[in-house]
Amino acid sequence: MSEFTLKTRLLAALEGKPVDKVPVCSVTQTGIVELMDEVGAAWPEAHTNPELMAKLAIANYELSGLEAVRLPYCLTVLGEAMGCEINMGTKNRQPSVTASPYPKNLDGAAVPADLLQRNRIPAVLEAIKIVREKVGPDVPIIGGMEGPVTLASDLISVKSFMKWSIKKTDLFEQALDISTEAAIAYANAMVEAGADVIAIADPVASPDLMSPDTFRQFLQSRLQKFSASVNSVTVLHICGKVNAILSDMADCGFEGLSVEEKIGDAAEGKKVIGDRARLVGNISSPFTLLPGPIDKIKAEAKVALEGGIDVLAPGCGIAPMTPLENIKALVAARDEYYA
């Protein structure tokens, strides 16, 4: 009988403390169509209805065996509350930002006093409370959200974000500061509602989009402020081949760094970050978990576990068309590793 609960194991693993086995969960989006059909909680309704949001999130814990409940399912909740226009997507396509409120300048841009009452934020907070009531105290809840860098680019548009980072650095920094403040407020509201871990996805901070120099000069300090100000264990997910900034990510103060398969194998990543942070991932969502087959999923999971991954997880958001049996295979791979 293990002395760990799912929650204490995950938190210990993220804090770099000894565990009996590596936890397996997802710190990125978990909504899949098969489960939407199975439990009757589908997108896009599950993005706005707290009962459906909770039901779909719990399904991937109860039916696949993932060892945490992670919600919501997109990176637009905070952006919408800050004035972005959103396309709510379809049953198998996530919501996305379609228009930014401040593409020309930041006149009138600020964190609204009623931020936490706006748009879908109350639904997410309510869903977290429902999940806690349903799964009890020993199952970890992971609150997901867009990171401050991605939020800033949503507020001013990707085009202005790129341009201002070079030509209008004062405006660029102002946008980052506003978005960092908003992100901290929302993250702490999720913690207060019952989230044990806050996982931010900050794809715009990736070297695929922003240079490592820009990361070090402007982005890193905002991520440090975020992790220092949020009252929980935190995980930073940045998409893509992040090798050029992985060491800088490890200095951002997050307990966990979530990475894709694009960084190479887990052992390499572990070498770079040392004991500054724990590595989460890095089983390919689009190229392994989505298409399978199961033996490939298990083989890649074994490589990650042998490489010293601290939390076994999909390398990015789970693709909505991923079969449930493929997610179960990820869990089985971890179990077999310790058998």
Curated annotation (Swiss-Prot):
One of its GO terms (molecular function) is uroporphyrinogen decarboxylase activity. GO terms for biological process: methanogenesis; methylation; one-carbon metabolic process; porphyrin-containing compound biosynthetic process. Zn(2+) binds at H237, C239, C316. It catalyses: methyl-Co(III)-[methanol-specific corrinoid protein] + coenzyme M = Co(I)-[methanol-specific corrinoid protein] + methyl-coenzyme M + H(+). CDD domains: Mta_CmuA_like. Its EC number is 2.1.1.246. Signal peptide: none annotated. Zn(2+) is involved in coenzyme M activation: in the absence of coenzyme M, zinc is coordinated by a single sulfur ligand and three oxygen or nitrogen ligands. In the presence of coenzyme M, one oxygen/nitrogen-ligand is replaced by sulfur, probably due to ligation of the thiol group of coenzyme M. The keyword Magnesium does not apply. InterPro entries: Methanogen_methyltrans (IPR052024), Mtase_MtaA_CmuA (IPR006360), UROD/MetE-like_sf (IPR038071), Uroporphyrinogen_deCOase (IPR000257). It is an enzyme of class 2 (transferase). It comes from the Archaea. The keyword Magnesium does not apply. Its cofactor is Zn(2+). Keywords: Metal-binding, Methanogenesis, Methyltransferase, Transferase, Zinc. Belongs to the uroporphyrinogen decarboxylase family. MtbA/mtaA subfamily. Methyltransferase involved in methanogenesis in the methanol pathway. Catalyzes the transfer of the methyl group from the methylated corrinoid protein MtaC to coenzyme M, forming the substrate for coenzyme-B sulfoethylthiotransferase. MtaC can be substituted by free cob(I)alamin in vitro. This is Methylcobamide:CoM methyltransferase MtaA. It comes from Methanosarcina barkeri. The gene is mtaA.
